[in-house]
Every structure is written in structure tokens, then in C-alpha cells.
């Protein structure tokens, strides 16, 4: 079983990363994508045109699709991200833009509805925050929608919050 660990932690001393490492401990088949080291660019019009042309020709060999293929092939997805501004760092949204590829992680049915193609049975969203976050964690809610669209049936939320509140 392959676990894809999408690491959206900004530094190695991250409390979120510590929680993720504890979750992943003992799992021998972890592929890690360190987003802050990838320098992924947000899509501009030129990239969109290139991607559309490749998708229309089902030309999946371009390196532009490597992250999407990796995501689609994983048995489990673990998203590790700090709680920033009610959700997550922008680098994680940029990653999802690169992963969301019609024909790899989902496709459209004849009725025009998206249908997931991912192998994963579960997506685990791990986060930490200095204050409260469970009342409004739009990051997890976003990934629940992504999991549904990509055909991943289970989502789980693991959070350590109030880490900077004295007395908690």
C-alpha cells in the first residue's frame, strides 16, 4: 500500500510535520511531496493552453502530469498542512491545480458530471493551529470536496489546536 504524503509545512520544525510523522510512523511505503521545495507556479494562460492541448490529445507523457499520476495511483493520501487564515498555505492550492487533471484523477460522465478515478480509499487531513480551528476549517472542507470529486470515499480530520493559548 502506497501512502502519498503531501507536505505543505513551511519548515522542518513544524508542529504539523511532527504530527504527520507520528501518523506515518511504521508505514514503509510513503512517497513525500515537499511543496515548499517544489517551486510550483500557479497556472497562467500559457500553461492552461498547453495543458488543454495535451489533455485533448490524451498525451499523458508530459511531466506536467507527473503529480496528478502520482496522486491518482496512491492508496492513501495524507495532507499535512498548518492552519493558515482559516485554511492552508497557498502552495497547497497551487499543488491541487497541478493535480486536478481531467482524464487522470477524474473524468466527466456522459451526463457531464465529474467522476473520480483515484485509487485511494482514504484522504487524511492533518493540521495544527495556535488557536482554535475546528469551528471553521475551510481547508478540510475544501479537501472533502476534492476527495469526493476524485472518487476517494473516506476523509479524516486530525487536528491539534490551541497550541499557543496559555493554559490549554
Label the model's feature ranges.
Residues 1-97, 101, 165:
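N-terminal beta1-alpha1-beta2 submodule of the flavodoxin-like/Rossmannoid cofactor-binding fold
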Residues 99-114:
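Short, acidic/small-residue loops that bind anionic groups at enzyme active sites
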Amino acid at each position: 500500500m502506497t501512502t502519498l504524503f503531501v507536505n505543505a509545512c513551511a519548515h522542518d520544525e513544524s508542529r504539523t510535520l511532527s504530527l504527520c510523522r507520528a501518523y506515518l510512523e511504521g508505514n514503509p511505503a510513503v512517497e513525500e511531496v515537499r511543496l515548499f521545495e517544489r517551486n510550483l507556479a500557479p497556472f497562467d494562460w500559457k500553461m492552461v493552453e498547453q495543458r488543454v492541448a495535451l489533455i485533448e490529445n490524451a498525451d499523458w507523457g508530459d511531466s506536467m502530469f507527473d503529480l496528478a499520476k502520482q496522486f491518482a495511483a496512491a492508496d492513501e493520501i495524507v495532507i499535512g498542512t498548518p492552519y493558515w487564515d482559516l485554511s492552508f498555505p497557498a502552495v497547497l492550492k497551487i499543488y491541487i491545480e497541478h493535480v486536478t487533471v481531467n482524464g487522470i484523477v477524474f473524468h466527466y460522465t456522459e451526463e457531464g458530471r465529474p467522476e473520480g478515478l483515484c485509487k485511494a480509499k482514504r484522504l487524511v487531513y492533518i493540521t495544527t493551529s495556535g488557536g482554535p480551528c475546528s469551528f471553521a476549517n475551510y481547508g478540510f472542507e475544501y479537501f472533502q470536496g476534492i476527495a469526493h470529486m476524485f472518487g476517494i470515499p473516506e476523509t479524516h480530520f486530525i487536528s491539534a489546536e490551541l497550541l499557543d493559548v496559555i493554559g490549554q
